[in-house]
Amino acid sequence: MSENKCPVMHGSATTTENSMANMNWWPKSLSLDILHQHDHKTNPMAADFNYQDEVKKLDFVALKNDLHALMTDSQAWWPADWGHYGGLMIRLTWHAAGTYRIADGRGGAGHGSQRFAPLNSWPDNGNLDKARRLLWPIKKKYGNKLSWADLIAYAGTIAYESMGLKTFGFAFGREDIWHPEKDIYWGAEKDWLLPTDNDNSRYSGERNLENPLAAVMMGLIYVNPEGVDGKPDPLKTAQDIRETFARMAMNDEETVALTAGGHTVGKAHGNGNADLLGPEPEDADIHDQGFGWLNKAKRGIGRDTVTSGIEGAWTTHPTQWDNGYFTMLLNHEWELCKSPAGAWQWQPINIKEEDKPRDVEDPSISTMPMMTDADMAMKMDPEYRKISEHFHRDPEYFSKVFSRAWFKLTHRDMGPKVRYLGPDVPVEDLLWQDPVPTGPKDFNVAVVKKAIKETGLSISDMVTTAWDSARTFRGSDKRGGANGARIRLALQKQWAGNEPKRLASVLSVLEPIAASHGVSVADVIVLAGNLGIELAAKKAGFDVTVPFISGRGDATDEMTDNESFAVLEPLHDGYRNWLKQDFAVSAEELMLDRTQLMGLTAHEMTVLVGGMRVIGTNYAETGHGVFTERKGALTNDFFVNLTDMNYIWKPIGQNEYEICERETGKRKWTASRVDLIFGSNSVLRSYAEVYAQDDNKQKFVNDFISAWTKMMNADRFDVS
């Protein structure tokens, strides 16, 4: 008998090195993993744990005092530069929040995801593991009342306060996740920091960055600080900066403020040989305990630290908030040089001794300041230069703009202001928060519903309009949704996916009802959709009441940043069987991505698609996927006929199929890829079979209503 190599009978591979998962065998199959991430089985907290309730018990004053004390409590295992951890903590917060991109709302500081791969091991996040370990005693002390996500975001804000900046405010309420995010596309590259011309480049054409990406390279948060592809050229770097920050929803003034404010304090580290650094946290030895980038061949701390490879401080006084960044940048001429680690950077020509920053360990030693290629862009690019000179002339204005931009950076993915918690929430409503006024709550729902019913609007029109209003919701950054009824405003009512003519006709009926009954249009739209579902269920033989929560408000054009909202325009909607155009990505993959953003599960997606097909909500009333003889009734016919082996499916064009009777060949229905995926994909078929069962007709209706209600209330953060 041969000796076994491993004494453990694994159910599956427990490391990725030698595993062959289903996706390796069948790479073209549709993976539903992004819909099942952050399952309760990964969460160590009790099922009834509510972080929003728990954080309200936090001693906010004590926490702030503890963080202030931490800033100057230098630890021998990772000493603070100049005795102050401010620069390190600001970088920690920056690099957590800075992953946000407006295109899909993913990334950002909202979930504490920097604790996990890949972010914890990105080259650009070098040595931020040290910052999190420095924060651990505080996290340990405050426990469940303080999430890692809130602590990481708060640390940088307090760091600025401790160095003299009057901050704009701070809000708590970010809830931790417990394993890496699966839904975020960081790029197709297989290696870190590859130049533009790599085989899996994120650029096309002259320099067109792939959507939804914002960073210029795999493993970077923003741009390459040494220059485009590591080649110094401030004007070219300025183009990258402008594109990257725009994709983070920042304008030129905010970009200059954030760049300058981020580099007013702290320093970059490159005083040594980067080749001597150990592996990143995810690849570190087990005895390193998640500590990465260890310099085991040298002292590797203090003045000998190597992180980015760039070496030096930007300002004369790197532990105080002042206008020194612009003084240093604009009052000197600069020349290219290389750091001790071999990185490109810029150094001032003929700088006075008194203008040099001190050594991080010995104040009697002066050091040469530096600027990155990105900093030089603030001087060389004409528009950035104007803003920089304005900030230099008016330090108070610079501080004001920066503090607001910092607040925006650290809160952009938190959603509406109603989600903000804590004593330092700013009173002012900001346009980028997508404000929505509170709507009337106390009205007779039955009377309004009766008025809607008497209009004679079709089931399809009522359900479709409510769906189109709600489907803009993104769980990633908590934007969009039915609250606010922005579907009736100038921008959204012209979106192709909203069928402008049909929408205008429906709104012309619903808006007078809202006005005459003193309720919001937002509530009337949702209530009409609910009524449509109830009528469709009645046609199928079920008397149901769709749950309704009043209180939605109506936003105005003045409350809406059209440029920011433009990214919410649907370019596809598998639920309504619609593509604005043909895309390189398959229709079913697009539906999966949209489903994840809306916060739905795979079985919720399944039941909603099946129900909406038979109700008749397809875009432009196309017949694809309407597998029923009882259109308008909420039946399980879609699933019954999809799983019926009396039919055969044939492609007749791109994303178009016909369903024929197997024996006669007679054409019965037509379908899209989105329809057929529920019979083709083995997991989705298993759900389809559940809803096709003879004993699950009531379950189908109940589950549809549950998923529908979830969507209608997805953005109701004002209710529990």
UniProtKB/Swiss-Prot annotation:
Residues noted as binding heme b in the record, renumbered to the chain: 263
Gene giving rise to this polypeptide: katG
Family: Belongs to the peroxidase family. Peroxidase/catalase subfamily.
Keywords: Heme, Hydrogen peroxide, Iron, Metal-binding, Oxidoreductase, Peroxidase, Signal
Post-translational modification: Formation of the three residue Trp-Tyr-Met cross-link is important for the catalase, but not the peroxidase activity of the enzyme.
Function field: Bifunctional enzyme with both catalase and broad-spectrum peroxidase activity.
Enzyme class: oxidoreductase
GO biological process, one term: hydrogen peroxide catabolic process
Covalent link Tryptophyl-tyrosyl-methioninium (Trp-Tyr) (with M-248), residues: 94-222
Note on cofactor: Binds 1 heme b (iron(II)-protoporphyrin IX) group per dimer.
Swiss-Prot/TrEMBL cofactor(s): heme b
Keyword Manganese applies: no
Domain of life of the native organism: Bacteria
CDD domains in alphabetical order: catalase_peroxidase_1 (cd00649)
Oligomer and partners: Homodimer or homotetramer.
Catalytic reaction annotation: H2O2 + AH2 = A + 2 H2O; 2 H2O2 = O2 + 2 H2O
GO terms of molecular function: catalase activity; heme binding; metal ion binding
Active site: 95
Name of this chain's protein: Catalase-peroxidase
